[in-house]
Amino acid sequence: MKTLAKFILITAALLLSTPSIAQSDVSDVSEELKIAAVEALIAAPADKALPLVTKVLEGNHSNEVKERALFILSQIDQPEAQSTLLKVARENQNDLGLEAVRMIGISGNDESLASLASIYENGNSEAREAVLEAYMIAGDKQSVFNIALTAEGDDFDEAIEMLSVMGARDELRELRGKTGVSEALIQAYAISGDFESLRELALDGSDVELQTQAIEAMGIVGGEQVDSTLVEIYRSATAEDVREAALHGMLISGHDAGVLELYRSSQDPSEKKQLLEFLVMTGSDEVWNIIDSTLTGDQ
């Protein structure tokens, strides 16, 4: 094992110090070898790999080679590795700096993750997005929640979208009490699969626009509870917008059986026409029998 580690270190040192060659084919081979050399450092002892990785980052190498070096740093459990990642993240307003931010997320180091807050506050939109990605990778819901509390506009939307991807239902519910209901929050409830929050909003008629958005978003969650609730909402609704939203929700969830049930129980020709149109959109096999029966006068 010591022989293998020694071979890796010698190979890496030689390849990473190789000068660039003019010929494109030879240059490509050299680049691939440098990448392989850096990746090989994953098996090297930390005290041996760290100096070589640092040398790569300080040298005249391509971003692709340096990005591999950043990953190796993320796997080295030493303070020096974390400080180097933070240094690259803070000092490079480019793809390399953004990659360093994401690598901090992969490392999962609590102190480094906490330091990303200042990069978020002072960085551009790409830097802020990279910080959110790092928190997602690390599973740090609290940090994303803290950002959402004070963020506005697109930054707020991106933060709650990230929370939804992380399945942070409790945090999203808490945000409702602090920031109010918005279309972005409704979509976040849908992505996180929060049926209860959506159902509560879907049954609240104080704001019809938000209500209809919540009803349609329930279709994204899907499942038996959603399907039965959408049918119930349709039957009890008096507003046309709400009824149509319920149909859209069933269309999204693929609940053609519910639309078929409503069609068969309806006695209103105008309503049956609309329901038939939705049945066609759902792709229900039964719709062709209904059309055939209608054309032959059986319905």
Q: In which residue ranges do the predicted regions lie?
A:
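Bacterial N-terminal signal peptides that target proteins for export
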Residues: M1-I8
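Amphipathic alpha-helical scaffolding segments comprising HEAT/armadillo-like alpha-solenoid repeats
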Residues: A22-S27, A46-E58, Q78-R90, L98, ...
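Positions within the helices of HEAT/ARM-like alpha-solenoid repeats
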Residues: L33-K34, E64-K66, D95-G97, E126-R128, ...
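N-terminal signal peptide c-region/cleavage motif recognized by signal peptidases
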Residues: S17-P19
